[in-house]
């Protein structure tokens, strides 16, 4: 038996000579770690390099996998991702590769406290997508998160208030004054005469990290977005928390345009390039309402909803 195994990627030329923009692997199951000593997260990775040499049959995919596996044993950081991309390029010097790209997708689990109940908290999952690319010695890293929130329609709220006030006037026609306790009792009995429609909504936010970024700062981006929206969905709730959530929704009525603009302002203060896509899963309509915005000079494409 021959001790040498055949390697057609090296020994056989391509019968259809052409350079390839990207070649590699997709949907690789691999664990990642966000901080030193933290738990590992199940992730999916894609990794590719370019193949400028038209006559070569293919790249060395095992090299990509081994480098990915080795580097991802370290906590995720902009520096580590940049080192990994350069190592991928260097590993394919015989292919004249000049560019590499990597994507990572996973869910970040965060424990969030209840709005009112002391000591009560629950877990929420945030989909995270990282896209890193190195070309001509320049590395760019994009970070995308998904945040769930509630949206109560301001138009529907106005219509509901009108119906409620009309019902009050009709029932108390001819009376100029009413005891306060009677008004309170009427509101208790009829306050839900009409209610505005609200729904679970989703915001996908993508940012490009500054070139000098030391950390991915995923949790900080989540907090920035949830603070701007003001009505993030809750995990563990009791009645006081549900009441507080109802109050937040009443104080933060928003249509899809409002939500997109709420996110745009703080993102513009922290990132030079960003893109926002929001979607309200309408309870009134059989379709969704959507809006997008982004930085004027953003090189980021539309987010996939």
Swiss-Prot record:
Pathway: Cofactor biosynthesis; 7,8-dihydroneopterin triphosphate biosynthesis; 7,8-dihydroneopterin triphosphate from GTP: step 1/1. It catalyses: GTP + H2O = 7,8-dihydroneopterin 3'-triphosphate + formate + H(+). The record marks 153 as: May be catalytically important. Gene3D superfamilies: Urate Oxidase (3.10.270.10). Its EC number is 3.5.4.16. GO terms for molecular function: GTP cyclohydrolase I activity. Keywords: Hydrolase. It is an enzyme of class 3 (hydrolase). It comes from the Bacteria. GO terms for biological process: tetrahydrofolate biosynthetic process. Converts GTP to 7,8-dihydroneopterin triphosphate. Belongs to the GTP cyclohydrolase IV family. PANTHER family: GTP CYCLOHYDROLASE MPTA. This is GTP cyclohydrolase FolE2. It comes from Xanthomonas axonopodis pv. citri (strain 306). The gene is folE2.
């Amino acid at each position: 038996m021959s001790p040498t195994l055949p390697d057609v990627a090296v020994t056989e030329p391509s019968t259809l000579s052409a350079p390839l923009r990207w070649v590699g692997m997709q949907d690789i199951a691999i664990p990642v770690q966000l901080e030193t000593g933290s738990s590992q997260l199940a992730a999916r990775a894609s990794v590719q390099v370019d193949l400028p040499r038209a006559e070569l049959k293919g790249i060395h995919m095992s090299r990509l996998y081994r480098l990915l596996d080795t580097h991802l044993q370290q906590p995720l950081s902009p520096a580590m991702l940049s080192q990994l991309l350069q190592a991928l390029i260097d590993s394919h010097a015989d292919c004249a590769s000049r560019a590499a790209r990597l994507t990572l997708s996973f869910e970040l689990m965060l424990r969030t406290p209840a709005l009112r109940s002391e000591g009560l908290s629950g877990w929420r999952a945030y989909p995270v997508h990282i896209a890193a690319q190195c070309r001509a010695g320049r590395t760019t890293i994009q970070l995308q998160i998904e945040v769930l929130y509630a949206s109560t329609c301001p138009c529907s709220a106005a219509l509901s208030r009108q119906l409620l006030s009309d019902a009050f006037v009709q029932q108390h026609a001819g009376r100029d004054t009413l005891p306060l306790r009677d008004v309170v009792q009427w509101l208790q009995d009829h306050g839900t005469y009409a209610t505005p429609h609200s729904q679970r909504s989703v915001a996908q936010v993508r940012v490009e990290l500054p070139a000098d970024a030391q950390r991915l700062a995923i949790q900080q981006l989540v907090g920035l977005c949830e603070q701007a929206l003001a009505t993030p969905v809750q995990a563990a709730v009791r009645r006081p928390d549900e009441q507080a959530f109802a109050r937040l929704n009443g104080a933060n009525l928003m249509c899809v345009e409002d939500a997109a603009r709420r996110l745009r302002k703080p993102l513009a203060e922290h990132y030079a390039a960003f893109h926002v896509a929001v979607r309200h899963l309408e309870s009134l309509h059989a379709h969704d309402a959507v809006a997008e915005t982004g930085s004027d000079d953003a090189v980021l494409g539309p987010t996939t909803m």
